[in-house]
Amino acid sequence: MKDLLNLLKNQGQVEEFDAIRIGLASPEMIRSWSFGEVKKPETINYRTFKPERDGLFCAKIFGPVKDYECLCGKYKRLKHRGVICEKCGVEVALAKVRRERMAHIELASPVAHIWFLKSLPSRIGLLMDMTLRDIERVLYFESYVVIDPGMTTLEKGQLLNDEQYFEALEEFGDDFDARMGAEAVRELLHAIDLEHEIGRLREEIPQTNSETKIKKLSKRLKLMEAFQGSGNLPEWMVLTVLPVLPPDLRPLVPLDGGRFATSDLNDLYRRVINRNNRLKRLLDLSAPDIIVRNEKRMLQEAVDALLDNGRRGRAITGSNKRPLKSLADMIKGKQGRFRQNLLGKRVDYSGRSVITVGPTLRLHQCGLPKKMALELFKPFIFGKLEMRGLATTIKAAKKMVERELPEVWDVLAEVIREHPVLLNRAPTLHRLGIQAFEPVLIEGKAIQLHPLVCAAYNADFDGDQMAVHVPLTLEAQLEARALMMSTNNILSPANGEPIIVPSQDVVLGLYYMTREAINAKGEGRVFADLQEVDRVFRAGEAALHAKVKVRIHETVNDRDGGSVKNTRIVDTTVGRALLFQVVPAGLSYDVVNQPMKKKAISKLINQCYRVVGLKETVIFADQLMYTGFAYSTISGVSIGVNDFVIPDEKARIIDAATEEVKEIESQYASGLVTQGEKYNKVIDLWSKANDEVSKAMMSNLSKERVIDRHGVEVDQESFNSMYMMADSGARGSAAQIRQLAGMRGLMAKPDGSIIETPITANFREGLSVLQYFISTHGARKGLADTALKTANSGYLTRRLVDVAQDLVVTEVDCGTEHGLLMTPHIEGGDVVEPLGERVLGRVIARDVFKPGTEDVIVPAGTLVDEKWVEFIELNSIDEVIVRSPISCETRYGICAKCYGRDLARGHQVNIGEAVGVIAAQSIGEPGTQLTMRTFHIGGAASRTSAADSVQVKNGGTVRLHNLKHVERVDGHLVAVSRSGELAIADDFGRERERYKLPYGAVISVKEGDKVDAGSIVAKWDPHTHPIVTEMKGTVTYVGMEEGITIKRQTDELTGMTNIEVLDAKDRPAAGKDIRPAVKMVGLDGKDLLLPGTDVPAQYFLPANALVGVADGAQIAIGDVIARIPQETSKTRDITGGLPRVADLFEARRPKEASILAEVSGTIAFGKETKGKRRLVITPNDGSDPYEELIPKWRHLNVFEGEQVNRGEVISDGPSDPHDILRLLGVSALAKYIVNEIQDVYRLQGVKINDKHIETILRQMLRKVEIAESGDSSFIKGDQMELTHVLVENERLSTEDKFVSKFTRVLLGITKASLSTESFISAASFQETTRVLTEAAVTGKRDYLRGLKENVVVGRLIPAGTGLAYHSERKRRREMDKPTRVSASEVEAALTEALNSSGN
């Protein structure tokens, strides 16, 4: 009996492991796995259904079909365990061994493994240094390959067709060896001397100059080193033994009616065995070569189809014309092993049902139908019934439950008490898609859900379904309660703002009760306290909206944890006083003394959480909800068609617009305007008309005339139901009301272009047939868009999760001093996001000083909370360096200081938090809200006039940043740099706005000047680019000859003459190479030099430049020598929404990207080539000049002699992130990508914290490219993991050797996921075949560091509570180590002890 227990205990237990290695299987290894050879293609006997001997289901090889019973039935039962029946040869064992035992097929002729042949780059091809085409010709018996040339003129590896082979035979006889087929390839692979080849390649690479050759050689070298290091032998890529999968993994099931359902693999194996047996027979018969050859080729094709059907040639199809599913198809794709069974499994103890609303529940509860609870908690109920003695056995308990006796319900209620259940709604886009609740038993069949958690689940009650899961173990229940309870998830992990926020009815109710009305019943009364207000309201003596005075007693918590009590009389309304009754102590009355719109309610809950804590907030949120529902019921808000008040002015506005359109039409007819201009004008006109109608409508709706206490008629905010819904933020918006009561306006065609004729009607008036038809256009496009968007957004989320899944907080502080420089985010001159908001929840990397002093006001290492934010804003700090995930130096994972605050909890992030996945979910979840469209800049947008001045919006002090300028005689400054900026700071020194200043801008203010709001501080001409002189002197023309390089023009209007420089192609032959310029000469006639350099001051003039100064004229500093006309930049389509986010994360290079200066120095233009200009930058430090050819059509922002800094824009266009990283570094790249992505989300009103984007960016920057290898084993141009290179460099520097130098590389998220260290994670993401092939050849080890790998091998993930489990496991093993001693050590110790005692 003891044996039996031990046996059951040790079944299939695996020793602990820390890594998984994948490699090539040698023939010996395949034979060692095998339990016998499959010799026949038979499967099972069609009459007896017993497996055939030596067939694909043979019981002798694979084990018995029934538990502990041999095939012929001689031995049955457990007592014969392990006996091998002498009659049928079957071992008596468990039937489940048929899932584990493998067999093999001895192949009559070697066969190349298709993965190593055809998966690009072909590994066999690389090793043999032959093209794939050539190898295929050898393998499929089209050509001979020379294996050993002997003493002949042939070369090893040379291909010979039949003709050449026979010629060679005639010429050389048996002196050489040439064969075809996989044996030839195997021979060649076997003959490769890895060590010798590696040495040869290492010598060859430094001596090669061509880039492509180096690439090819280093690829070969890498592969050879991989083979050498992994212990794989090259010839193992050619199979001589084929393993056979255990039969229960490729089942054959008899169906009714004598037919069988079978796995495709069986068919594929049968073909292989058939062909193999036939080949053996042919070889025994020594058949003609051509027949044998054909059979070998067919065998090769059969094995190819088994391993990866369809990889080469046409896929083999079954009886129903469907391609057969091969081994490779089993593991790849959504239905493959990885994604279907290993990463996502079905769960027991779960149920699903429709959800309905549970307005009476508390936040931590959900309503669970009794029937469902009974089924889910069955085992618990059985146990309880037995424990109580109500049932004697489990069977009896089962009967009781089935009969649904009254005792059962009592027991169920007891079992369920404080046993949380998990509720999940698909699609689970972020972690709030699964939360824990305490179940409350309800009648009926639908699950009841608390209204406040709907936002997190994105649930509504129009037929949504949700799933219930029961956490069984005590640990699971504990985690569900402590971490997943809905009451612990009040804040959104994406932005740290409350997600448990009332919406719709609740908002409407709260808004209604906090509005004020003029001359309502009880206006002007004064109340002693809130209780009195309550009594008077209930008695009906005062209306809800009456303006009254109330004495209130409030306790206000300050930020330091203290509290102040005070009593005051406030002007308020009855409703607000009633609402204050549910507000927790600690908050001031001012938070409710306003109409409670949605934003205000959200702010109130946020403040409540920060000031009084979690518990109070949860209670308060519930109370808010109850109150909101109560008062929205009382309000009786409903919509009737009369609520849509159409403005009287509408007809007049539309008539006027129609008249103007007619006028434009007649202009077009008479040829005064072009089609495009007409279109743009008409669309602008209608847009304006639409705005006017909606303005009139809103002013109509939002005000109503009432008579106040004194009998005077006054305006008050309207109580129109529709207006209240929109104003409170409960439902609808001004844009929607406009369509209902104003006019529908312009419609777009499916391709995005706007239709000229707008819909002038609204929904109250009704649409005509034509108008309805036009509007269907847009509506259908919207539906099609939504469907596409969902799929695209889901795929983006999947890629993000995959790239970031192994990023976990693993230590508290990595000790780095680096970080990102944070400044306020400015767009179009306005501060969109102040500094305070951006640094909230971050750790300061370096001390922050009070501006203008040496006093540290925020020390490094401070976690910035709301209190610090106020402090930073007050001290008018413009920039702060904060720790960031990008600059974190933790090797595996990230440190808590660099991450900062855990947004969902409001304190520093815990060790073990899976911040990568949270970041991916936060960015991916709102993806469905982003638009899919590309914005065509048409209509109004394309004709916004180019900016030509800076007009400040706020008064304040001028600050100039990074601006190179010269001062003109009249005291104005002229900008002579491109990156200059002008900012306006308020009285506290906080920047309010910031503007870019172009080259040549005339600035009428100086640093520190005070300006008033609305004043214009800078001007420039947007249509020309000036060349400004930086010194005074005399103008001298160089190479400017009329008719050859220049022409004079007289302006007809002004009568002034201008000199225009001719384009090179318009010049006569004599002027082609002359470069016209304007030189500055001093009074002594000598050339002047540019200030601070020894470069003569001469300005080369590009084609079409207009020169405005005469030869010999005197000019002063800041004067314009010439103007270069700018053709207005072409309107580019802006990629918006989801595609833009995907482009940024995939790090795609944009078309016609901007050109940046590669080095800092002086610009010059060299000799032009056809269609290209030669740009030369001479560095100031005297190193070699940098040259670049730029197409002529690119408009350049720089001219000869100008100084540029590395990374400055030379030609405009969309930025290329790779250029930014290379030239400006990681922090500039981070700033660019974060801002670009935030712009897309901000447009949709979605808030995401910057650190999530930085977290993904950290993963995209994992790799580096080796620039110089130093004394390391790296090869120049290799891409390596950053951590790997850093570890190696540390080792080298301790040994006083030369370290390798590297540059950072930016990878797109798909590429980064595929190039991760873990092959399990990469294989389960995409391109499974390629990943596994590469991993097997290089003998990769997966150290199971990420989450995905651990899920696949069925372990706890190394994050959250799992991290503690893993570290504890490792610690235990370290402690156990000394106790594990080998026998030889024991013997040695004994001998020593005996010897010493003997002396």
UniProtKB/Swiss-Prot annotation:
Gene Ontology BP terms: DNA-templated transcription
Binding site for Mg(2+): 460, 462, 464
Residues given in the record as Zn(2+) 1 binding sites: 70, 72, 85, 88
Entry keyword Magnesium: yes
EC number from the UniProt entry: 2.7.7.6
GO molecular-function terms, A-Z: DNA binding; DNA-directed RNA polymerase activity; magnesium ion binding; zinc ion binding
Cofactor(s), names only, from the UniProt record: Mg(2+); Zn(2+)
Alphabetized Pfam families for the sequence: RNA_pol_Rpb1_1, RNA_pol_Rpb1_2, RNA_pol_Rpb1_3, RNA_pol_Rpb1_4, RNA_pol_Rpb1_5
Reaction(s) this enzyme catalyzes, per UniProt: RNA(n) + a ribonucleoside 5'-triphosphate = RNA(n+1) + diphosphate
InterPro entries: DNA-dir_RpoC_beta_prime, DNA-dir_RpoC_beta_prime_bact, RNA_pol_asu, RNA_pol_N, RNA_pol_Rpb1_1, RNA_pol_Rpb1_3, RNA_pol_Rpb1_3_sf, RNA_pol_Rpb1_4
Free-text comment on the cofactor: Binds 1 Mg(2+) ion per subunit. Binds 2 Zn(2+) ions per subunit.
Highest taxon of source: Bacteria
Ligand binding (Zn(2+) 2): 814, 888, 895, 898
Keyword terms of this UniProt record: DNA-directed RNA polymerase, Magnesium, Metal-binding, Nucleotidyltransferase, Transcription, Transferase, Zinc
Transmembrane residue ranges: none
GO annotations of cellular component type: DNA-directed RNA polymerase complex
Assembly and binders: The RNAP catalytic core consists of 2 alpha, 1 beta, 1 beta' and 1 omega subunit. When a sigma factor is associated with the core the holoenzyme is formed, which can initiate transcription.
Family: Belongs to the RNA polymerase beta' chain family.
Described purpose of this protein according to its UniProt entry: DNA-dependent RNA polymerase catalyzes the transcription of DNA into RNA using the four ribonucleoside triphosphates as substrates.
Name of the protein this chain belongs to: DNA-directed RNA polymerase subunit beta'
Species the sequence originates in: Pseudomonas syringae pv. syringae (strain B728a)
Gene giving rise to this polypeptide: rpoC
